Amino acid sequence: ITAALAAAAVSGCSSDAARRIEAGGPRSLVSVNKINMADWNEAAASLVNDMLSSGCLDSFKPKPVKMAVGRIVNRTSQAIETDLLSRQITIALNNSGNVRVVSSDAYSREQEKYEAFVNDKKVSLPKLVMTGKIIEDRESVDGVREVTYIFMLSLSSGGEVVWESQKQIAKQAD
């Protein structure tokens, strides 16, 4: 009986039961050494809000303006999937009605060329190109570790930068 009670007590103290949480929400795990879903969500929302509120898209006609997605360069110590940032941004921009993101896959590009040929039109090039960079700054003082991730984004048109912004997310751990 004692062994059974001890086993029940030990198993009751820890649980491997999984539970669903909101991705990037308040119950998500936070790590200093990793860009978490909450970081991706915060960076994307901040950059999109900054872009849309800046008025940088107002001068482009007709709406929605075509935009291509260039490289998002990873300059962190992690192997990260930059699509976690760029895809959230392009979804929000497409949904805003101000921007239409041009597909970069070969099949879509060939289809666009074919439709232009059949309709005796030229293939229209994107007026905007979105590029970016993610860098990190690491610091440690008296046993406290801190990392700041800097998410930089730019829009260019005809070789000129028409908008740029950055979002910094800093995290600490003892």
Question: Language-model segments: which ranges?
Answer:
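Bacterial Sec signal peptide processing site at the extreme N-terminus
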Residues: A7-N33
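Structured loop/turn residues at beta-strand edges in well-structured enzyme cores
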Residues: A8, V123-K127
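Amphipathic beta-strand/beta-sheet edge segments enriched in Tyr/Trp
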Residues: S14-R19, K127-A173
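Acidic/histidine-rich, surface-exposed loop or edge segments in extracytoplasmic proteins
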Residues: A23-I35, V65-R75
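Solvent-exposed, acidic/flexible segments
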Residues: N33-A44, Q78-S86, D142-E146
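N-terminal segment of the mature soluble domain
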Residues: A45-F117, K121-K122, E160-E164
